């Protein structure tokens, strides 16, 4: 949590954990991630990314292998959002630190952006040679600059907040 340095979230294969004392003690906070009777077998507990909204510290997003979840009460309860992306394996997520309510997701079918806190989504794959995106980061110095790592097609860059992507030159080992 960028505004409350003592609050930390961690996504694991067993769900989301929260610490309120700088990682001294961790508690599971999975209420609403999956129905209790499916807890042991659900892919929703396999959390691949957790991001806190920089404008609303009680709003947290959890990307899972079974879709996207959101809490607005500091992880007391979760709601599944983004039904357009239902059951999608999300492997990376960015909550934009400049554009309020903007969230980016990456997975096997590319990159998606929501500008309304996860209610609606737009696919933003123009320029990507593959849709299998494995990592996604926003530049610390330029909020419109993003990098996406793919499975098999290398690294891509977007200079316009994901509207278009261009392949980066191959990285080679120069010994």
What do the predicted segments below correspond to?
Residues 1-175:
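Extracellular glycan-interacting surfaces
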């Amino acid at each position: 949590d960028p505004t409350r340095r003592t609050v930390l979230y961690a996504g694991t294969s067993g769900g989301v954990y929260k610490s309120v004392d700088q990682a001294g003690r961790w508690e599971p906070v999975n209420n609403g991630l999956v129905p209790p009777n499916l807890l042991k077998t659900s892919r929703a507990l396999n959390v691949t990314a957790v991001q806190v909204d920089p404008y609303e510290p009680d709003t947290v997003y959890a990307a899972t292998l079974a879709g996207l979840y959101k809490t607005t009460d500091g992880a007391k309860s979760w709601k599944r959002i983004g039904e357009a992306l239902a059951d999608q394996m999300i492997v990376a997520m960015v909550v934009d630190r400049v554009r309020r309510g903007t969230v980016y997701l990456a997975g096997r079918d590319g990159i998606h952006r929501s500008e309304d806190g996860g209610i609606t989504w737009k696919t933003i794959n123009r320029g990507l040679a593959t849709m299998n995106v494995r990592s996604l980061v926003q530049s610390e110095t330029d909020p419109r600059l993003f990098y996406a790592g793919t499975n098999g097609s290398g690294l891509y860059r977007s200079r316009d907040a994901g509207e278009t992507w261009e392949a980066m030159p191959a990285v080679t080992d120069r010994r």
